[in-house]
């Protein structure tokens, strides 16, 4: 059974914030890795018989070029931040606000000045690369922009490219794992500080703001995503937003949040109890904890050689079976987990819609089963885990306890 713990963790229990030397080492590691990253993309381009790749997602641009255009949100880049890769060149499109930054961060790239009228410069861009067929991030480029580019250079064929860079980013390099680990430690310390200050009568917004302050002053460059702080029945909203609702004794308090460190993100959910847990919520917590343990145990068994490496769908099924057996299958609608890195949601997907292929390695993903009773209560427990076939066990990167914790009293 999950322990009921009355003592609370201390921020000093967790890894210290990254140092300047850590960040310098990560920058060097990225620079050394980029030629290999670009080669993999160019191999895909050659296999698809395309002359260039047109990308617009900010984390893809950072991964391939080093140019950082990121405000802490997963997003599609604007006109500054679009890029082209050919067999010989990398071209960054940047307006006057970012030219100096792009030149410094991506020294091997050609920087092209752009305005908000990309179609106007598109013909000369593709001509300068000798491109007759261009692969385009089809899931991200709008129908409108696709049509504009076709009309601007009708002699250039646009080809849909789906998941080309994502497929490479799912396998994490050592320096990427280090940064995710550091982001997890920032989150661990921040929550350890906040749980000591929770009191009945505080609002969700007050606690979310306090947690954000701890994250930003504790070594993070930004939030990984907007904080969810949900009290009582609001915890039944898997992606709810903080409100003026107050914390009350006898109810749950759910935090879902993450830190971003040098571009890489963490993601953690903890469900706490204000005072003594009521029997219903405590029982639900036990089920969710058992479901998470079952999924991680399935991963562990593969690394020990007891079972084959599971697919994302199988890892999800292990957690889902526990919740369904407890009679709450209809109260667990989302997937068990998702990959994470430069974006909050990446491959692999641990869900009923996940791939049937064995999970890649090494990779980092969340394991986050939950049970949600509409208008009543909700419980989710989320950890990031490192799945690495070279290891003997799955490593939890988020280390804040998953025991039943009572706070606010």
Predicted regions, residues:
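Active-site neighborhoods and metal-handling regions in enzymes and metal-associated proteins
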Residues: 1-409
């Amino acid at each position: 059974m999950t322990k009921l713990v009355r003592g609370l963790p201390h921020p000093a229990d967790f890894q210290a914030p990254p140092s300047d030397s850590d960040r310098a080492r990560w920058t060097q590691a990225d620079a050394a890795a980029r030629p290999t990253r670009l080669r993999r993309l160019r191999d895909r381009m050659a296999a698809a018989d395309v002359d260039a790749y047109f990308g617009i997602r900010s984390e893809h641009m950072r991964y391939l070029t080093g140019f950082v255009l990121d405000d802490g949100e997963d997003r599609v880049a604007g006109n500054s931040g679009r890029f082209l890769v050919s067999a010989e060149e990398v071209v960054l499109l940047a307006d006057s606000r970012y030219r100096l930054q792009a030149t410094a961060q991506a020294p091997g790239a050609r920087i092209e000045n752009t305005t908000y009228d990309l179609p106007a410069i598109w013909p000369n861009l593709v001509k300068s690369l000798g491109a007759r067929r261009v692969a385009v991030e089809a899931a991200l480029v709008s129908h409108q922009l696709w049509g504009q580019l076709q009309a601007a250079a009708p002699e250039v064929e646009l080809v849909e490219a789906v998941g080309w860079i994502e497929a490479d980013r799912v396998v994490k390099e050592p320096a990427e794992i280090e940064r995710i680990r550091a982001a997890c430690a920032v989150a661990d310390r921040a929550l350890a500080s906040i749980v000591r200050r929770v009191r009945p009568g505080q609002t969700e917004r007050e606690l979310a703001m306090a947690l954000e302050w701890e994250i930003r002053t504790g070594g993070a460059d930004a939030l990984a995503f907007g904080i969810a702080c949900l009290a009582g029945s609001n915890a039944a909203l898997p992606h709810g937003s903080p409100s003026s609702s107050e914390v009350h004794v006898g109810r749950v308090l759910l935090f879902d949040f993450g830190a971003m460190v040098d571009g890489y993100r963490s993601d953690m959910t903890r469900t706490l109890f204000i005072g003594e847990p009521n029997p219903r919520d405590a029982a639900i917590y036990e089920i969710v904890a058992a479901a998470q343990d079952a999924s991680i145990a399935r991963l562990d068994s593969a690394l020990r050689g007891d079972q084959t490496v599971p697919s994302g769908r199988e890892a999800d099924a292990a957690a889902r079976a526990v919740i369904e057996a407890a009679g709450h299958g209809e109260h667990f609608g989302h997937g068990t987990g998702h990959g994470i890195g430069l974006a909050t949601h990446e491959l692999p997907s641990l869900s009923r819609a996940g791939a049937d292929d064995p999970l890649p390695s090494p990779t980092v993903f969340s394991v986050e089963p939950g049970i949600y009773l509409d208008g009543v209560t909700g419980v989710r427990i989320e950890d990031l885990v490192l799945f690495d076939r070279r290891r003997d066990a799955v490593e939890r990167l988020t280390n804040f306890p998953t025991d039943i914790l009572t706070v606010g009293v």
